[in-house]
Amino acid sequence: MSSPPLHGLSSGGHLSRDPPPRSWSPRDKCSYLGLSHGNLRVHYKGHGKTSKDAASVRSTHPIPAACGIFYFEVKIISKGRDGYMGIGLSTQGVNLSRLPGWDKHSYGYHGDDGHSFCSSGTGQPYGPTFTTGDVIGCCVNLIDNTCFYTKNGHSLGIAFTDLPPNLYPTVGLQTPGEVVDANFGQSPFVFDIEDYIREWRTKIQAQIERFPVGGEWQSMIQRMVSSYLVHHGYCSTAEAFAKSTDQTVQEELASIKNRQRIQKLVLSGRMGEAIETTQQLYPSLLERNPNLLFTLKVRQFIEMVNGTDSEVRCLGNRSLKSLDGCSGSDSNCSNGIISNKAHQTHCHSKSQSSNLNVTELNSINMTMSHQLNSYSSNDVEMETDHYSNGFSASTSNGFLNGSSRHEPELEECDTEMEVDTSHGRRQLCGGSQAAVERMICFGRELQAMSEQLRRERGKNATNKNMLKDAFSLLAYSDPWNSPVGYQLDPIQREHVCSSLNSAILDIHNLPKQPPLSLALEQASQCLEMMAQCGIGSCAFARVADYLH
């Protein structure tokens, strides 16, 4: 007995958006049939006097074309009085008071005479009869639209050709005492369907490899590879590859290195430095893309919680005395990240005492979320006089440093979030009280920035949910092991990095996405389209199989 894969019955589940058949349908059966054992066992409960007493049941779903090859088995638990049983396929709407095969778009192999029935009441000799204890398999090949049966693990040959799409596995019974069990992959099959699947996979892959490709395809692929290396900032590799293939790099190497530098900052969680570097190298980029800037700022807030952003790391390494000096003077921290000095002075002047009450720190999440929900769910515009000067006097659109001259006062609440100082668990903002204070001020900046974006550009559900999710991290004493802790995973930086990189490329009139990636995506989309159009060979053409 061969053991089927997880899906157990088809070869191309990776493309199918529709569920395959897994059981018989209690809503798509004749009343003379009863179901049990998880809707896998069928028993006859009619009179069984004439052919008019026949009864059939269909599966819960049709066979998706993306399966490529679909197989199921039926074990005869009891042949009953006469063994008038049929196993096969039918489309939706076929009369269920008949055995499969007797009507149009219905196909069946019957146990009493071994005949196959193809949309007709007249059968054709096909295979042996079957009775109690036998296991009958039915295999639908959606590549060549054929069907064959098996008996006790042995193939009986092709039974039907030119099959229509959207067929349902079907079983029919006609006399008292007849009982059958279906196996849609829940258990190992008697027939070695995996060997048959491997045979067809080899055929399809050979067709793909033999497909002729005209034109100068090698040079085209080389250009695609070169653009991919340039896009992702692999400066040295791109230069070496271009030299070995006699190409010229489209983008200046200095520009590639600048993008590479920014990407490294983002991927290491140093969002403050990444934003500042972007503003220095591409002064108008974030000014023209306020939603992108907001995304970067939200990621910076998350990295502050994580303790990885340069700004909170800088504060965590300083004494409170030097912190006061930094926030009240024109000097920056050594890494040059704390650039919004005026706002820091404002924030720190509110809490000259270094020991800000922990409860006040911990209440920030509920308060921020409350205010965010308040303005986001209210269609009436808020009074905005105290924001009229924007976030920063030094920028034309008021978004670049993300601060407000007049911040909304946050209400106190009783909810407390623990700032854990134990050694057995990671600590909020790296365990620095000063860094937590800065994070809270930064959270207020983000909230104000979100409000201004809404007033000037309208509602944005993506921005709203992004900020709510980020603030939700503060609702847990251990954000890393919370339901929203996935945000702290370094892999979440990759999407932000990609968005920023694409925006930089756009201002250089270079593709936002590398042609190689677009080609792979197009191939994947073509396979999905093939599945939707009922072309079963798509099941054996996984793009991933050709990436080495």
Curated annotation (Swiss-Prot):
Domain CTLH: 255-312
Subcellular localization(s) per the UniProt record: Cytoplasm; Cell membrane; Nucleus
Domain LisH: 217-249
Highest taxon in the source lineage: Eukaryota
Keyword Repressor recorded: no
SMART domains: CRA, CTLH, LisH, SPRY
CDD domains xref list: SPRY_RanBP9_10
GO cellular component: cytoplasm; nucleus; plasma membrane
Topology within the bilayer: Peripheral membrane protein
Key words, A-Z: Cell membrane, Cytoplasm, Membrane, Nucleus
Oligomeric and partner information: Identified in the CTLH complex that contains at least MAEA, RMND5A (or alternatively its paralog RMND5B), GID8, WDR26, and RANBP9 and/or RANBP10.
Function: May act as scaffolding protein, and as adapter protein to couple membrane receptors to intracellular signaling pathways. Acts as a mediator of cell spreading and actin cytoskeleton rearrangement. Core component of the CTLH E3 ubiquitin-protein ligase complex that mediates ubiquitination and subsequent proteasomal degradation of target proteins.
Family statement: Belongs to the RANBP9/10 family.
Designated name of the protein: Ran-binding protein 9
Lineage: Eukaryota, Metazoa, Chordata, Craniata, Vertebrata
Gene name in the database record: ranbp9
